[in-house]
Amino acid sequence: MANSTPAPLSYAMDTKTRAEIVICGAGIAGIAAAHELAVVHGVRNIVLVDQEPPMTLTSDKSTEAYRNWWPGPDNAMVTLMNRSIDMLESWSDASANQFLLNRRGYVYATANAAKAEQLLADAALAETQGAGSVRVYRNSTQAHTYQRSAHRGFHDHPSGADIFLDQSSIRAHFPYLAPNITAVVHARRCGWMSGQQLGMYLLDAAKAAGVTTLSGRVSAVDTSGGAVSSVMVLGADGGEHTIATSTFINCAGPFAREVGALAGVHLPLFSEMHLKAAFEDTRGVIDRNAGLVILDDAQSLHWSDEEREELAADDETLWLTLPLPAGIHLRPEGYGHNQTVLMLWDYHSTHRYSVPIFPLEEDALYAEVVMRGMVALAPGLEPYVERLPHMYVDGGYYTKTEENRPLIGPTAVRGAYVNAAFSGYGLMAAPAAGELLAAHILGLALPEHAAAFTLDRYERPEYLAQLAAWGGTGQL
């Protein structure tokens, strides 16, 4: 589905040169920003700097999904994502769907009957925030009007969400789910894509519009007089390059905090390790037409009495007997006769990293823990627990703010901008974030939601008060 390993960034730059804009980071955030500035607005002489090949540090470790289904407390995230999805759909049409955009949806499931009213309230809020109309099915007759998602593509699909509150209807439409599931929300303007293909599509267009790339690490940013004047890059050959510029964009992903410090800017960021596992579903348990399916309940893993006693006796494994967070999720990967299923459970979120560690710390139990947890969502997977299949595990970091909203816009240093803190939603947010960032840089009119993502929001007393009672962050 995706290209083979991308080629390293090109290396063709004098030791002292000038650029209109220097972008640090060739993940999806940096590439989308370069594309917006060069292709859409015609900005020339943009240099994209990264010590790794494009889209290889964290951008290629995601589940490659997108959604417009986000919590409040306002409509900023829904508005940002709706705009991103508009752009993704436009690019897909223009490229004959080169990056395989679909609209399978997100399927949120719960076995907690008491959650039904909360799901309805959340959906009503999402509707007012612009996520689309909500359709509620309380019996099988009402559910007869439900429209299934197509295997491929995104045209002619409903938006909004379908809410099932009748177990017989849930069994009819989602037969792989556990029989105790009592409510399901199928959010519809959601799906996934090939992130690698999207990144290469945008990067190729940006290069054709004049963006150049430099393989190296940003080692210093000169901000004499309170403004950006140059950027130093330690090149792949070990030589140091000075690029005179008045505009520097920090798209450094998990290293955004450290890169911000180079420019004298403090970014309130931390990172959480996230892993995902892939296996071949040779038993055909998961419907190949399924969306991204999430268990919205916390759970405790099932163990025999003997296993539980043994695990509880060791401080290193005691956590395996305790409740684990909601949000375990899976989706089928690939089309046609592909049998791959991706699974993710973000149970590492209690450990925060101020500085990310590479390579990632190993979690030797991850594959088994996720498979055991997934049985609560799809019981047909239980035979895989008894005989664990080969599972490929990789991962990266969710680098985020406390409220899990991105940083997009200027900083206190003139000419220094940030486009980071995209947590686990970088692929889906990058298009609209790049557009928003370009508006800041070029002095264009800003949409109302722009203020929700600027760094100076933390200087507003009303925002700090809102932050203290934030509620859900939408993290998966």
Name each model feature, range by range:
Residues 2-19, 411-476:
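C-terminal lid/capping helical subdomain adjacent to the catalytic/cofactor pocket in oxidative enzymes
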Residues 13-29, 47:
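Beta1/beta-strand and adjacent pyrophosphate-binding region of the FAD-binding site
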Residues 38-60:
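Glycine-rich FAD pyrophosphate-binding loop
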Residues 79-80, 109-116, 185-204, 213, ...:
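Short beta-strand to alpha-helix junction loop
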Residues 178-180, 184-247, 251, 255:
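Helical element adjacent to the flavin cofactor pocket in flavoenzyme catalytic cores
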Residues 250-292:
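Glycine-rich loop(s) and the adjacent beta-strand/alpha-helix scaffold that form part
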Residues 281-413:
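Active-site lid/adjacent beta-loop-alpha segment flanking the redox-cofactor pocket in flavoenzymes
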